[in-house]
Structure formats: structure tokens, C-alpha cells
Amino acid sequence: MISTANNQRVIVVGGGLAGLAGTVRIAESGVPVDLFSLVPVKRSHSVCAQGGINACNDVARQQGYSEWEHFDETLYGGDFLQHQPPVYEMAHWAPKVIDLLDRMGVPFNRTAEGQRALRLFGGSLYKRTHFAGATTGQQLMYALDEQTRRYEAKGMVNKYEFWEFLRPLLDDQGRCVGIVAQDLRTMQIRSFRADAVVLATGGPGLVFGKSTNSVMCTGAAAARAYKAGVKYANPEFIQVHPTSIPGADKLRLMSESARGEGGRVWCPAVKDDAGNWKPHPEPGKDPRQLPESERWYFLEEKFPAYGNIVPRDIATREIFQVCKDGFGVGGGNMVYLDLTHKPAEELERKLGGIMEIYRKFVGDDPVEMPMKIFPGVHYSMGGLWTTYTPGPDYDKIKAGQMPVQTPASGHPWDPEKRPAAGMDPNASNNMMTNIPGLYAFGECNYQYHGGTRLGANALLSCIFDGLFCGRSVANFVAEHADDPASSKPAAIFDNGVDAEEKIQNNLISSSGDENPYAIARELGEIMTRECTVVKDREGLEKTLTKLDELRDRFSRISVADSGMFTNQNLSWARAVGDMIDLADPIARGSLEREESRGSHYRTDFLQRNDERFLKTTVATYNPSTRKADISWEDVEHGIVTPRVRDYSKGKAKAANNGSKPDDASNHHDKSTSNGPTGATDPKDGVRAARPEQAPHAGAGQTIGSTTEPNT
């Protein structure tokens, strides 16, 4: 328990899973928390998460799974762009996180024996995803909100709902000592002192216009921190989810859990005399009348080991390409996600949430009719730059001084005896930005997912950030007990309020001829077209030119409503300017990363280039140009050697001889896989193949179990 003399306290901005978990952990440490949220916390975007949360448990362990496997497949899925210590720590904390949530009362689905049920999810051949139907995010949110209200009742948490973060406040040494925020009901702007500030504000989906994100997910808070001096990392890595429902207002997610539970992706097609697939002559024909011979299960055909549960960037590009090649439903931009072969009772029990969404917004019943889906912008792997302190064993492993006993060498992975190669739990800088005292948790930081996030790792990373790194925040507060925010000059806070009121007055008094809603629409259109599924130099340069135009036009906007009570036009107009500023590093990072890695796919640079780009993109805001200056930071990969990412077969496999293969970056299993090829079994959607692993970077040992999972 930390003593908080001098009225020390912490501000958490964002009431989603990362914000609530952090609030609970910090309050538990004895530090009072002021919790700010645009909406009532139970309405935060985390409630929209559907599929599940990844972790190893005893049942998964019986398949041959382990925390090490979770760690490795997360790196492999992310194309090795993550710093490895944070991912290592997260994978080993995952079982504890699930146990804690279970004790909090989260209604996880159960097996007949009472064990927590597990489902398949993208990027893994093991069932290791815990779930609560298809409303997992909502159930986790409600559990953490109950714990937050427990501390609220004790006077340790004050909620400021319907308040918007405007800027961080820094003292003369550059330390964050508070924020300026605005009451969205009265439009009052005021300052708040804090000894540390946590941003847990989610992703920038609205930068792309339509997305699966809630309409409040503008990325404005991260943009304001970025413009205040926080670096922004890997902005070009934007995840486009392969299965969403197009809508006039936004996109609605059809969870990856549908594929994990046996859903099959296909398009109407016929084979020519040479056996090649061709677009169907009647692409709009009732899918229920199409025989199996006229259904192209293209993911299962191209990726036999993983089938429909390949990682999202791969599935998205394949769907995008078959539609571009004329195979889409009705000749358009949709394919089928088919669950009609599954029992109705099972679908309602495991996927009831998304079934209800599809019926409501489309009008068809997925039990009877294959769903029509198309990829949609979903998640940002990039975010505010953060740091951490690695555990004491990391440098020894990196230098080859501490061999790691892995499953492949005949040693079961024991999480209790694991090397301390993750993050130091006693450090005060875990997930701190380059501004001391300012932290970033959840989707608005960049640490865990690299080039592509594996499904069901998002909820884990959010809650892990809050629970593990919340302790770092409390430690930072304790370290600065002799220099509290309460002792800082009033001018710091008054000047911040004055600056924000000036920005607001300029917006209200602006009498230009530009409509901020039209600017936002054009921004979303070009960002979606040029900065998502496929990219090239011409399109990215066109985007940067368009951003210059939009930036100029934004200076001439007119806000329709000049009132000072619940003025949503004013709040939106300001966010549009921030979205333009955040779009710049996304496009600029995409242009300067001349390779294809994870979700970043350049048609003019099709290969991954580790020599030049096994690095973090770091964007720094330049106030004079209002654009990003791009630099590069080496990625820490001292535990697992990066290797080629190839989901057409199991994960890369090395000889089990205790030494590195000649080429640790490119060694694939050329032998015939034991058992089924991995195509979906209509009965249960289970894979029988297993992924193999590459050697440990420090000790040169083969890592990965030789045991086939019993699924």
C-alpha cells in the first residue's frame, strides 16, 4: 500500500477495459484515481469486443499448449515487430488474468465438466481462447466496472463521465502533472492536477471514416498527446478485420469466433476444364442452392494448416483479392461466412450475440442463410510510444549466457520457474511514454501486437496493461512524493486552460465556407482506399497531398452550432483537426516503410525486409510543419529468433538437435503433416495439425512441443 501524502492522485483517461483495470490496480495500491470518460464507462467501446481472451490453462496445457507457445505465436503473428519482453510477460500473466476475472464473476462458457470452455481463434492451432458467448468484452467490462464502483464507494475513485481530454499539462522539467478537460454538457474547460496520467483512450477508427469502432473512437486523445510531444510508434500498422457487415453509418463486426467455431468462408465459383476456379456465371444465386462443387473455400485451399483461422491480415487480403478478381457475391465486394452446417442450439449458445446483430441489421438468419461479409477497419497495432524495464534475465538470454529449457528439448514449460525475461514489476516506467508521468495503456499504445494482432489478444493486452503496469504508475507516484503535483505553480494549469479556451473560441468564431463533416468524409475515404489493405507509393503520396489540402481547408471551417451547452458540433469539429494530424504519421510511416510486414502490405515492396525494417517506426510531431518526422528504433528480439511467417503450413520448424539451423529466419517443415490437413471439419471446426517453432535466439535450442494437441 502506497502512502499518498500531499494529496497525490492519478488521472486515468478512458473507461474501457484498460482504463478500468488500471483504475482498480492503482486504487488498490492506495492512490486515489480520477477517472475520465467520454461516455458512461459501461458504454465504452470495449463492450463491443465479442470473441474472447487468450490464455493457457490446464485444459490447453493437456493439448501441448503453454505460456511459451502463446508468447511465440503472438510474435509470429505480429511478424516479429514487437519488443519481446512485454509480450513474454503478458503471455505468462494471461492465466492469472483469467483466474482473476473468473473470481470477479465473469460468466465464461463452461464445459459439461465445469471447466472454462475454450475455442479456436486466428493464428493458433490450439483451443486457448476463453469466452462468454459472443459478448466477452461486455462481460469483462461489467465485472471491472463493479470493482471500480467498489473503490468509488470507498472514496478512492471519482468518475468524470461525459468529460473529454484536451491536453496534458507539463511542468518546467517536462513531467506530466495534470490535464485540461472539457465537460461535454456545460462545455466548461478546466484543469486537473495529477501526479501521473494514464491515457487508455482506444484506437483511431474514425480516421478511416467507417470502421467497426464506436463513433467516439476518433483517436483525438492520442493525437493531442502526440502534438504535445509524445512519440507515436508504428502508425502504419492498421488491422482490417476480414468479416464485418457494411453499413451506411458504420461497419459492424462479425467476430472471428464465428470462424473459430467452425464458420467457413467461401465464394460462388466454378472450375474450368483445367481445374482452375472461375467466377460463377450466377454470382447472385441463392447460396443455399449452390452445390459444394460451386463453392470455393479459398482460405482452406490456400492455407491448409490453418484454413479459416489464419491471422486477420492474411484473411483480409485474400477476401479483398477474390472480390477484386470478380468472385464476390453478386459480382460485388462481399463473400460468404457460412455457419449453416452447425447446430442451431450450439450457435445460439456460443455465438448468440453476433447472431442477434446480423439478424437485426441484415434481416437474415445465419442459422439458415450464409452471412455476407467484407473486411472493415478494426484496430490499430500502432499507438503512443511507450517504454519498459526488462526483467533481470533478459540480457543474459539475449547474450546466450542463460539457456532456456524449452518443450522441444524435453522439458515441460514451467511458468513458475520461467526466466525473468519479461518486464520488471517493480519498475516505474512500464508503459510510460517519453513524457515522464504520462502513460498509455491498451490499444492507444503499440507494444504487444507488432505487425498484426492475433484475435483475442486485445482484451488480454488491455487488462494486462492495467493490472501489471498500474503498479508502475503507483510506484512513480511514490517516487515523486517529495515533489507532488499539488505543489506546482497555478500558472501551469491556468495557462493550459487559457490555451484551450482560445482554440475553442477560434473554432466558434470561424466563419469559413468549409464543412468539418465533409472534410472528415473525404479523409476517411482516402485513408481507407490508400492506407489499409494494399498500399503503394503513388497512393500514399496522393494521400499526403490530400492531407495538405484538408489541413488547409480545415483552417476555414464553419461550426454550425455556436451554443455553449452540449455542443456536439464543436467537439466533433475539433476532433476532425486532430484526426487529420494523426492521419499524417499513418500515411507517412506507410510510405517510408518500404516492405510488406503483417497488415502493412506494399504492392511495390512485396517482401519483408528485416535488414532495413526490423525496426519500430517512431513519429515525432513537428509543430512548424504540422507533420511527422520519422525515425527508427531497433526491436528487441533477444528471446526468439525472427523467422519467415508462413501460414500455408505449420509454424517454421527447426531440427531438434540443440543447435540453430543454418538459416534461422527461413526453415519450414517440408514433410507431410501428420493427421488431417487442417481444413475445417463441419462438425466441430477443430484443427489437428500443430505449429512448430523456431530456435531460441540466445541458446540456439529448438523451441516447441513435439506432442500433437488432443483437440
Descriptions of predicted regions:
Residues N6-Q8, M187-A196, N434-I435:
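Core beta-strand elements of the Rossmann-like FAD/NAD(P) dinucleotide-binding domain
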Residues R9-L35:
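N-terminal Rossmann-like FAD-binding beta1-loop-alpha1 element of flavoenzymes
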Residues E28-A49:
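Glycine-rich FAD pyrophosphate-binding loop
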Residues A55-M90:
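Glycine-rich active-site loop/strand segments that organize a redox cofactor
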Residues V97, D102-Q188, R193, A200, ...:
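Conserved redox-cofactor binding core of oxidoreductases
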Residues A196-R252, K324, V329, H449-S472:
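Glycine-rich loop(s) and the adjacent beta-strand/alpha-helix scaffold that form part
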Residues R224, V230-D365, M369-K372, P403-R418, ...:
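An anion/pyrophosphate-binding glycine-rich loop and adjacent beta-alpha core
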Residues F476-T566:
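Long, amphipathic alpha-helical stalk/connector segments used for oligomerization, subunit docking
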